[in-house]
């Protein structure tokens, strides 16, 4: 009887380990704004509700607004839930991104490009490494991002960067140093978000202008989750670069699993608006990382 119980207990442990290491980031922890963030500009255009569990950015003719993380990080999992500007939002951009602060900077971007009433939002992502970007991908979302809060997150380790929308991977950027492509592995980044007027380019290449009669525009945020390796000194950077020390370094997070690849392919086939990897006019020879990222 004892042997049977032991076997059953072992099976339970194995099943639990499969659940924990299934290839998806840990479930975000809902925390208020002030735990991890602070205003970065135009604090008079930021509203804090319910003790900071909900935060609104306001855009009008006089100003937009933005906030940033208090700490810098090298690798981790970063997410927040957002409800985008509703109605006629042409010309308005809401951004959530990670960025280092130097000339040859690294950056991981979400940019939500507003549109005329009834037209879908476009989500543009981009990855800068060593100051080089030009890796734009644009998709439509499969839901209305103005009707409720949805999760947007980044998983970043030494192997790859994965960008998620509601746990669906919409982009993977793998470490392609072996192909001569730089990868962000030694420059800590802060997390930023902002709401601003970009009607010179955001909607139909700048043809659609912001309708200020609809101002103020509001983007709302909640669940300010940060689970990263803090790095403010060279010594801390070295510690964060020690592989295997954190959960995001484990084998399950070194690549997408089969289900995640199917979901990524679903996004590619049904919702892609633009992908730099397949823009032959711009890149007659696809950039080297595109094959490894399964974008072509």
From Swiss-Prot:
Pfam families recorded: Glyco_hydro_16, XET_C
In alphabetical order, the GO MF annotations are:
hydrolase activity, hydrolyzing O-glycosyl compounds; polysaccharide binding; xyloglucan:xyloglucosyl transferase activity
Question: According to its UniProt record, where is this protein located?
Answer: Secreted, Cell wall; Secreted, Extracellular space, Apoplast
| Annotated GO biological process | cell wall biogenesis; cell wall organization; xyloglucan metabolic process
Instruction: State which Enzyme Commission number(s) the record gives.
Output: 2.4.1.207
Q: How is it modified after translation?
A: Contains at least one intrachain disulfide bond essential for its enzymatic activity.
Q: Where is the active site?
A: 107 (nucleophile), 111 (proton donor)
Known catalytic reactions: breaks a beta-(1->4) bond in the backbone of a xyloglucan and transfers the xyloglucanyl segment on to O-4 of the non-reducing terminal glucose residue of an acceptor, which can be a xyloglucan or an oligosaccharide of xyloglucan
Q: SUPFAM superfamilies, alphabetically?
A: Concanavalin A-like lectins/glucanases
Q: Record's family? A: Belongs to the glycosyl hydrolase 16 family. XTH group 1 subfamily.
Q: Output this protein's name.
A: Probable xyloglucan endotransglucosylase/hydrolase 1
Whose protein is this, by species? Solanum lycopersicum
- Which gene is the coding source of this polypeptide chain? XTH1
């Amino acid at each position: 009887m004892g042997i049977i119980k032991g076997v059953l207990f072992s099976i339970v442990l194995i099943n639990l380990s499969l659940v924990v290491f299934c290839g998806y980031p840990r479930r975000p922890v809902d925390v208020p704004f002030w735990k991890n963030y602070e205003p970065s500009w135009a604090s008079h255009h930021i509203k804090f509700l319910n003790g900071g569990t909900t935060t609104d950015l306001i855009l009008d003719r006089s100003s937009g607004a933005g906030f940033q993380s208090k700490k810098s990080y090298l690798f981790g999992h970063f997410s927040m839930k957002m409800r985008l500007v509703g109605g006629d939002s042409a010309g308005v951009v809401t951004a959530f991104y990670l960025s280092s602060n130097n000339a040859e900077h690294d950056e991981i971007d979400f940019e939500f490009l507003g549109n005329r009433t009834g037209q879908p939002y476009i989500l543009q992502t981009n990855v800068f490494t060593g100051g080089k970007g030009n890796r734009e991908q644009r998709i439509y979302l499969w839901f209305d991002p103005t009707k409720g809060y949805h999760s947007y997150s980044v998983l970043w380790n030494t192997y790859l960067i994965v960008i998620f929308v509601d746990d669906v991977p919409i982009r993977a950027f793998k470490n392609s140093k072996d192909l001569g492509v730089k990868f962000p592995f030694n420059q800590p980044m802060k997390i930023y978000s902002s709401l601003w007027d970009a009607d010179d380019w955001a909607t139909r290449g700048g043809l659609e202008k912001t309708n200020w009669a609809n101002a103020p525009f509001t983007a709302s945020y909640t669940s300010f989750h940060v689970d990263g390796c803090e790095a403010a000194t060279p010594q801390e950077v070295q510690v964060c670069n020690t592989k295997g020390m954190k959960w995001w370094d484990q084998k399950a997070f070194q690549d997408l699993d089969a289900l995640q690849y199917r979901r990524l392919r679903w996004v590619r086939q049904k919702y892609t608006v633009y992908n730099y990897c397949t823009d032959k006019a711009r890149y007659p020879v696809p950039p080297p990382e595109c094959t490894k990222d399964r974008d072509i």
